[in-house]
Amino acid sequence: MDKVFNVGKLVDFQWKLGVSIASNHSSQLNTPFITVFVKVLDSNSEVTSHSFELTIPEFKNFAQQFKDMSNMIETL
């Protein structure tokens, strides 16, 4: 079994849809993306904020992984 790392407790999860309006590559203009914002409570009771951007296919994969985790938890 894979090792499990305790990285903290997820206390907030937000996302927003954006569209690229400036880029060094014209092929990336008007490309939609998702920005994800998370807040995590660590073992020292400190909240840290993190953000990252995903393409639409990456976000769909990310969302599917959460659905899969939810389904697995429901079977326990």
UniProtKB/Swiss-Prot annotation:
Disulfide bond positions: none
COMM domain ranges (all copies): 9-76
GO biological process terms held by the UniProt record: signal transduction
GO MF, one annotated term: NF-kappaB binding
Segments traversing the membrane: none
Highest taxon of source: Eukaryota
PROSITE patterns, per the entry: COMM (PS51269)
Physiological role: Scaffold protein in the commander complex that is essential for endosomal recycling of transmembrane cargos; the commander complex is composed of the CCC subcomplex and the retriever subcomplex.
Similarity annotation: Belongs to the COMM domain-containing protein 6 family.
Subunit structure: Component of the commander complex consisting of the CCC subcomplex and the retriever subcomplex. Component of the CCC subcomplex.
Protein name, per record: COMM domain-containing protein 6
Organism of derivation: Dictyostelium discoideum (Social amoeba)
